[in-house]
From Swiss-Prot:
InterPro entries (alphabetical): Ribosomal_uL14, Ribosomal_uL14_arc, Ribosomal_uL14_CS, Ribosomal_uL14_sf
Gene name, Swiss-Prot/TrEMBL: rpl14
Superkingdom of the organism of origin: Archaea
Entry GO MF terms: large ribosomal subunit rRNA binding; structural constituent of ribosome
Organism: Methanoregula boonei (strain DSM 21154 / JCM 14090 / 6A8)
One Pfam entry name: Ribosomal_L14
Protein name: Large ribosomal subunit protein uL14
Keyword rRNA-binding set for record: yes
HAMAP family hit by this protein: Ribosomal_uL14
Length: 132
């Protein structure tokens, strides 16, 4: 896993509901905790593009519902600024379910994937149809 190329805003807090953009069976997920977050003074854990979180499946197939899974954020509504000055934002907040080795559990990704995520996770980049 490589480092992020640009500083992405952490716009997604715990409790946020996101769409799942792969074919694992999960449709709507909710953030439970963020990996690598060490807060102070009762601050809410937040995350952005390329961050990994533990999420619970709220809507989906019966075998996926009510399960805790790991997920990577591939799209977020909050715009981010790239080093060349370009500002990028997406229509929705979306994640992809991954395993302990940060490899995707599904076989396809619906919709675009941010370039920063594709560079950081090569398997996600190879599965994506559109990289923005």
């Amino acid at each position: 896993m490589k480092a992020k190329q640009s500083k992405t805003p952490r716009a997604l807090a715990t409790g946020t509901k996101l769409t799942c953009a792969d074919n694992t069976g999960a449709r709507i997920v909710q953030i439970v905790s963020v990996f690598g977050y060490h807060g102070v003074r009762r601050r809410q854990p937040k995350m952005g593009l390329g961050d990994i979180a533990t999420v619970t499946v709220k809507k989906g197939t019966p075998d996926m519902r009510k399960k805790l899974v790991r997920a990577v954020v591939i799209r977020q509504k909050k715009e981010m600024r790239r080093p060349n000055g370009l500002r990028v934002s997406f229509d929705d907040n979306a994640v992809v379910v991954v395993d302990e080795k940060n490899e995707p559990k599904g076989t396809e990704i619906k919709g675009p994937v941010a370039r920063e995520v594709a560079e950081r996770y090569p398997k996600l980049g190879s599965m994506a149809t559109i990289i923005v």
